[in-house]
Amino acid sequence: ARVPSGGVDHAYITNALLAELKTSLTPHTDKELRSIYFGGGTPSLAKPAHIARIIEHANRLVPLANDAEITLESNPTSAEVGKMAAFKAAGITRYSIGIQTLDDSVLQRMGRLHTGAEGLAAVDRAKALFSGRVSCDMMFGFEGQTLSGWRQDLETVLDHADSHLSLYQLTVEPGTPLFRDLNAQRVMLPEDDAQAQMYEAAVELCGARGFRHYEVSNYAKSPGAQSVHNMGYWQGRQWIGIGPSAHSRFTDPASGQRLRTVRIPDIRRWAQNCMERGHGTGETEAIDGAEAKQEAVVFGLRMLDGLSNEQFMRGNNSSVASGREPLAEYLCMERVRQHVRDGYLRSTGDLDHLAPTERGLQVIDSILLDIIP
């Protein structure tokens, strides 16, 4: 989302969010909310009172489950850490802190406003308020990073970590300054082999501290510490995104059709549309049966627990899933068997269940390209 110069009117944006929330949730009042996730930007810059209004409004429209997970993403600046207790009072139950790295020079190049020491202090503060419900985000594969430096940083973060870690490999998006710098050879990232070693080091070090690797980039100390919200994405559940650039996947109650929607990215145009017509949706597209099947496999095999044939055939319980063939008929079985023999996939029965091995999870994108018709 593009934020206009001079900042935004918090009250106006909150009212736009509430309008979009009402329009989006009203058709689903027979459901319950399993999770709410404030992310995609820096939601911790919002006023806690406005976060509370959004949670209360959502709960009035579609009741929150008794054990609903309500996460807030935050950067560990002193201003945001100072609001942590107020966010808990507003209804936040889980706190996700974007440490990224402990290298202060890299944080400066990223434009981050915190130091590595402040990142660790924020984790300690969050643990006191959200014990067992704190996640730390770290990144690897950036310029100048070495395997030994990554191992040292991760060991230090693990000394402070609570129950969940998200460890992301740096991705370079086309059109970004980093993309242009790479093409001009002004920046050199670690070689692919070095980044693979960093990934393997993360699995090793987290495992030694009791963090189970349950998804490509995610580690949890117990099943209860896994991100309920993100698991919803990977398991093909319905989600509704509110706000500029937000994406949604849900089944339309009227037609039974699975839909994909994207909100308008420009924050001013999005807010104006919300106030005038109740939502800022820019695109709506029906997801056909072929795409729904592909998504089920792509998302399901991002998890170490994988995908069962029953889950695949059930789909999202919408009309596009009716009559879906078994996994063994959908996938290229010759290639699946080869990856099983090579130790990248594991399966039971006649593909009653399919999952990546730890080794396979590291190269799952190339495996998916090979087994999906």
Predicted regions and their residues:
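C-terminal scaffold of the Radical SAM
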Residues: 2-27, 31-326
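A short, conserved structural fragment
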Residues: 337-351
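Minor-groove-contacting beta-hairpin "wing" of winged helix-turn-helix DNA-binding domains
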Residues: 352-357
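Short, amphipathic alpha-helical interaction segments positioned at domain boundaries
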Residues: 358-373
